[in-house]
Curated annotation (Swiss-Prot):
Keywords: Host-virus interaction. Pfam families: Gemini_AL3. The keyword Coiled coil does not apply. InterPro entries: Gemini_AL3. GO terms for biological process: viral process. This is Replication enhancer protein. Increases viral DNA accumulation. Enhances infectivity and symptom expression. Signal peptide: none annotated. Homooligomer. Interacts with the replication-associated protein (REP). Interacts with host proliferating cell nuclear antigen (PCNA). Interacts with host retinoblastoma-related protein 1 (RBR1), and may thereby deregulate the host cell cycle. Oligomerization and interaction with PCNA are necessary for optimal replication enhancement. Belongs to the geminiviridae replication enhancer protein family.
């Protein structure tokens, strides 16, 4: 859903993509919070994927933040280690696919979190399209 207008994103907008080799460093990955709930064997990573300026311009986006909460049982991986692993798997999926779009990035995250140590993945996105 477009967070500015409240309208649903169409299939054409979600599948509109650009070749990955046309844009250098198309995605920014950031962990902005790591939680260790008490008395549990889980760790929660709050990961944010931001589209770079050139990718947003090619896809006619004003803002594109994809926020994920990844609930894992992996207590040994720190935030930076998990972020490197997550980034590598997402980029590997997108490199094999060759086209980067909103839906392909979400599919790449599903590929990266389809592991035995991942329990849940919660998504919360902030996407705004350009009007002009």
């Amino acid at each position: 859903m477009d967070s500015r207008t409240g309208e649903f994103i169409t299939v054409h907008q979600a599948e509109n993509g650009v070749y990955i080799w046309e844009i250098a460093n198309p995605l920014y990955f950031r962990i902005y919070k790591v939680e260790d709930p008490l008395y549990t064997r889980t760790r929660i990573y709050h990961v944010q994927i931001r589209f770079n300026h050139n990718l947003r311009r090619a896809l006619h986006l004003h803002k594109a933040y994809l926020n994920f909460q990844v609930w894992t049982t992996s207590m040994t991986a720190s935030g930076s280690i998990y972020l490197n692993r997550f980034r590598r798997l997402v980029n590997m999926y997108l490199d094999q696919l060759g086209v980067i779009s909103i839906n392909n990035v979400i599919r790449a995250v599903q590929f990266a979190t389809n592991r035995t140590y991942v329990n849940y993945v919660l998504e919360n996105h902030s996407i705004k399209f350009k009007f002009y």
